[in-house]
Amino acid sequence: MRLQGRKIAILVESDFYEPEIYYYQHRFAEEGAEAHFLSRLWGQPSIEFKGHELRAPLRCDESFEGIGDENLGQFAAVIVPSGMVSDRLRYTDDVEKLPPATEFMRRVFARPDIVKGIICHGMWLLAPTPELVRGRRVVVHNNLFGDVKNMGGIYVDADVVVDGDLVTGRAGTVFHLFARKIIDMLAGDTA
């Protein structure tokens, strides 16, 4: 088990892609890592989210909003998954302020010791903070090509792209390749 005792945070909301989320639950555990599903809980102790394809439930009882900078380092990686998760998480009551999930990712990006994983439409979450992507090599779903260009990212036509501490994946259907790259990086395997 190459990731024994490590923690991986996965942001979640309704309309998640079930095969991807279930794969992370099991695959990271196989390597000894704990998968922690984080969301905005809106003052509730937990929320049950529904998947996109099967409407399968996923209960979340951990919020990224309560994680201070001193506790951010408990996570070896933070993943923004595919589906509509990022679109739902980028909602904010006050349009003059960053959405809480985007603010969380801004703090994650300030930590080079944390691997950042963004797959498919997950890049939407960073749209309000283009400086996090500007000049970095990334891949996204074809629908987000224009968004990445507008953010100043360097689009690479590949299924998975690594740029330092940032791993990006083209589409939710390549979650296995995306997860493998994150596992290899966390295990120190650079091949």
Regions found by a protein language model. Give the residues of each.
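Extended, subdomain-level signal for the structured scaffold at the beginning of enzyme domains
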Residues: 1-113, 124-134, 145-191
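A short beta-strand/loop micro-motif in the catalytic core of glycosyltransferases
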Residues: 116-117, 138
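Short, thiol/selenol-centered motifs that function as redox-active sites or metal-ligating centers
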Residues: 118-122
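Substrate-gating cap/lid alpha-helix
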Residues: 140-143
